[in-house]
């Protein structure tokens, strides 16, 4: 089983890496250009992330209201998750961490996370050897997704909201403080280290879900493929699903934030690489406008290209 999973990871990395382009630069030129461009786009990564919220305040308001509604119903939905999902999805992916990393405490190199991190490392290493510029950009953007997701969730959002994690099971005192049965238990502060602190005040949003969706979005946009990145992300997420210990809204917010992070990274990278986003070009958008007047009563359909 362990050998099969390792072979599967190699095949996934190979499938993603297989999209090549004509070689125009030597290895060192390609490597240097990718690193320089990716470093220079860091400010724009966050500019694009900010635009995700500021470009359409009405939509942002709808999302905020929806999240508030999820928080209000968290006790019901989280209890249902604990009662019906966690007991019925019970598996653990085998450990694939190499022996020389046995002493590492980096959460992205151990456990289930390794199934996402190692293929990215393999993709980037293979792209370096093959002088594949696109593969190198994808690898760097994926590493950015991990770094940004970790910093935004652990340093910024969790420090701001400081929400405590739910008891497991809810309505008990099985774990005790800082786990809680109160879904409005916010602003509790943080203790010890900020990046990987103890459980107090670390519920909203889920760092793992944020990172999983950020990585999946980067790969989906770069390779125009939903099945491989989101399929792998789903398998990894449900491995040891009990261990996540989050309210439902924590995971939903993580998925939204992660998607925005991944999309912002790729759009910023595409702009620097001269790749135009033509995904909406040629699509017909229809707007339906009711019209009532003395001359006409009906539905006006306006098409935009």
Functional labels for PLM-detected ranges:
Residues 64-69, 131-139:
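Membrane-interface helix-boundary motifs at transmembrane edges
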Residues 1-2:
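N-terminal secretory signal peptides that target proteins for export/translocation
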Residues 68, 124-125, 155, 237-238:
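Alpha-helical transmembrane segments of multipass membrane proteins
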